[in-house]
């Protein structure tokens, strides 16, 4: 199961890199969001999927799952939500000001010689 999740995380990373390298601001935002999801999936997979039980004390349990990766992932999800919201607002304001979401057309004004 862990090998499958690592491959899925790699595929998500490849898709997100493709989206980040595109010319559209919305695709760049979606690529960064997908990259954070791929990193979260990789971290939760490395935390262990099938070893132990929930870290709540019970009498007859010999091993527990490490709760640190789960806590880090929850924090990363909240931070990713906030940065995605900020990027979406920034992309929307850029579109309203410039009339385009194409990064190539946002290069700036040529200098007067």
UniProtKB/Swiss-Prot annotation:
Record protein name field: Na(+)/H(+) antiporter subunit C1
Family classification: Belongs to the CPA3 antiporters (TC 2.A.63) subunit C family.
Keyword vocabulary terms for this entry: Antiport, Cell membrane, Hydrogen ion transport, Ion transport, Membrane, Sodium, Sodium transport, Transmembrane, Transmembrane helix, Transport
Main location: membrane
Record function comment: Mnh complex is a Na(+)Li(+)/H(+) antiporter involved in Na(+) and/or Li(+) excretion. Na(+)/H(+) antiport consumes a transmembrane electrical potential, and is thus inferred to be electrogenic. Does not transport K(+), Ca(2+) or Mg(2+).
Compartment(s) where it occurs, according to its Swiss-Prot or TrEMBL record: Cell membrane
Description of how activity is regulated: Na(+) extrusion is completely inhibited by the H(+) conductor carbonyl cyanide m-chlorophenylhydrazone (CCCP).
Quaternary organization: May form a heterooligomeric complex that consists of seven subunits: mnhA1, mnhB1, mnhC1, mnhD1, mnhE1, mnhF1 and mnhG1.
GO cellular component: plasma membrane
Membrane topology: Multi-pass membrane protein
Stored Gene3D superfamilies: 1.10.287.3510
Disulfide bonds: none
Lineage top rank: taxon: Bacteria
NCBIfam families, alphabetized: 2a6301s03 (TIGR00941), PRK08600.1 (NF006372), PRK09094.1 (NF006573), PRK12660.1 (NF009303)
Organism this protein belongs to: Staphylococcus aureus
Gene for this chain: mnhC1
Alphabetical GO biological process terms: proton transmembrane transport; sodium ion transport
Entry's transmembrane regions: 1-21, 28-48, 72-92
InterPro entries for the chain: CPA3_antiporter_subunitC, Mnh_C1_su, NUOK/Mnh_C1-like
GO molecular function: antiporter activity; monoatomic cation transmembrane transporter activity
